[in-house]
Amino acid sequence: MADLVTVVKKTEEEWRAVLSPEQFRILRQKGTETPGTEEYDKFFEEGIFSCIGCKTPLYKSTTKFDAGCGWPAFFEGLPGAINRAPDPDGRRTEITCAVCDGHLGHVHKGEGYSTPTDERLCVNSVSINFNPAKPSSIT
């Protein structure tokens, strides 16, 4: 049986009211930020990264790694939090928030990173927010 997810749907105007122009461009218009320009690329504190649009938890900090690509990289998302779909160009796989359908970035496979999944979920920093761990809450 599939997980039940409460979907967040908003009009373009409602999204514009709660997101910055750059967040809107990336989450709602499937944009990409300039590599190395945002806060979470070299950020390695313990906690949870959530969707900036709907606050859904997406990634544990323990799955983040330094891929040297200029964007935050994770080797997996939280179960049921991320959707994957082929890009129209057929070359990449887009990742979106399972709750609000916000564009997060792309997944790349088989690049040889020594991670459990051999995947790099390349995420735009402005599409996520960091929530620090409480003592003994991250495993």
Swiss-Prot record:
UniProt GO molecular function: metal ion binding; peptide-methionine (R)-S-oxide reductase activity
Protein name: Peptide methionine sulfoxide reductase B4
Top-level EC class as recorded in UniProt: oxidoreductase
Free-text comment on the cofactor: Binds 1 zinc ion per subunit.
Cofactor: Zn(2+)
Organism per entry: Arabidopsis thaliana (Mouse-ear cress)
GO biological process: protein repair; response to oxidative stress
PROSITE patterns in alphabetical order: MSRB
InterPro entries named among the record's database cross-references: Met_Sox_Rdtase_MsrB (IPR028427), Met_Sox_Rdtase_MsrB_dom (IPR002579), Mss4-like_sf (IPR011057)
Function: Catalyzes the reduction of methionine sulfoxide (MetSO) to methionine in proteins. Plays a protective role against oxidative stress by restoring activity to proteins that have been inactivated by methionine oxidation. MSRB family specifically reduces the MetSO R-enantiomer.
Cellular component per GO, a single term: cytosol
Disulphide bonds in the chain: C69-C122
